[in-house]
């Protein structure tokens, strides 16, 4: 029967199978919802997997308070339209300390407002499994991570101590306090994601489409000026350029690309000739050598 499935149908079936397995084997799962294209695909798959019922788990957004405004508007609109259970967690201690990407740098900001905040939320609600939208084609540390990725009671990850997943048989056993991060999109590529979004008509944040936007050039990256908190460096000037984003995060740490791709068809065509990873647009991946693996070891998404 599977021989008659298309490539995207096979990926969809695998992801839905993983989601249903987690729902059946864990007492308190959660889906991490970062609002980007991969999260939009995860949300769509979750709605499909348990239809006509709603997904039997909440969706958690870790809000750094520095996301693009259009991302937050999109998040709230989707939650209202689809009626899923949305949890929003902010590291209030980090807010009180004034942690921000300008004064503290991307490394400190990401650790406190994302990694620590995520660990806080997982502990607060007692989740034993957390879905994430990471894909193996994104980055080398994600390439070697299992679909079911074991985490200690302190949410740390040891890449040298991973469980085998031969024949797509997943080990779901965890002791008290331990948890699993689950990545249903592990075997998808960026092109797969866009072709699936086009095929299924999945709503996405408008920032993915090319449009004239106010930007500055900083450190070889094109940064969008999203609000009045943007601190310009000496000599920097804001200019209007036709840009879009391949990846979304905190706006001061996310680079845009020059593009005229204003439709899903345009984006798919652009992806067919792309020769770089979307992660090149994320400043947090440039902090230091092995930056992403270090973050993941500490409990990052």
From Swiss-Prot:
Pfam families: PAPS_reduct (PF01507). It catalyses: sulfate + ATP + H(+) = adenosine 5'-phosphosulfate + diphosphate. Keywords: ATP-binding, Nucleotide-binding, Nucleotidyltransferase, Transferase. It is an enzyme of class 2 (transferase). InterPro entries: PAPS_reduct_dom, Rossmann-like_a/b/a_fold, SO4_adenylTrfase_ssu, Sulfate_adenylyltrnsfr_sub2. Its EC number is 2.7.7.4. GO terms for molecular function: ATP binding; sulfate adenylyltransferase (ATP) activity. Belongs to the PAPS reductase family. CysD subfamily. This is Sulfate adenylyltransferase subunit 2. It comes from Chelativorans sp. (strain BNC1). The gene is cysD.
């Amino acid at each position: 029967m599977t021989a008659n499935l298309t490539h995207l149908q096979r990926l969809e079936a695998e992801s839905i199978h993983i989601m249903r397995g987690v729902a059946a084997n864990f007492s308190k799962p959660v889906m991490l919802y970062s609002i980007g294209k991969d999260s939009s695909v995860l949300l769509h798959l979750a709605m499909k997997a348990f239809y006509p019922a709603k997904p039997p788990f909440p969706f958690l957004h870790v809000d750094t308070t520095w996301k693009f405004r259009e991302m937050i508007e999109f998040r709230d609109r989707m939650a209202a339209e689809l009626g899923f259970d949305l949890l929003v967690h902010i590291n209030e201690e980090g807010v009180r300390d004034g942690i921000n990407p300008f004064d503290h740098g991307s490394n400190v900001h990401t650790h406190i407002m994302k990694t620590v905040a995520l660990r806080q939320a997982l502990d607060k609600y007692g989740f034993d499994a957390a879905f994430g939208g990471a894909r193996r084609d994104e980055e080398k540390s994600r390439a070697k991570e299992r679909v079911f990725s074991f985490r200690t009671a302190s949410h740390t990850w040891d890449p040298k101590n991973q469980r085998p997943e031969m024949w797509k048989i997943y080990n779901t056993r965890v002791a008290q306090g331990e948890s699993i991060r689950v990545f249903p999109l592990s075997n998808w590529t960026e092109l797969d994601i866009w072709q699936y979004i086009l095929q299924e008509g999945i709503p996405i944040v408008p920032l993915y489409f090319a449009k004239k936007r106010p930007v500055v050039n900083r450190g070889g990256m094109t940064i969008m000026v999203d609000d009045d908190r943007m601190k310009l460096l000496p000599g920097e000037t804001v200019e209007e350029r036709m840009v879009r984003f391949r990846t979304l995060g905190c706006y001061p740490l996310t680079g845009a690309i020059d593009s005229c791709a204003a439709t899903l068809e345009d984006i798919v065509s652009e992806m067919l000739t792309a020769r770089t990873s979307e992660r090149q647009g994320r400043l947090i991946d440039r902090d230091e050598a092995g930056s992403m693996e270090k973050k993941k070891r500490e409990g990052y998404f």
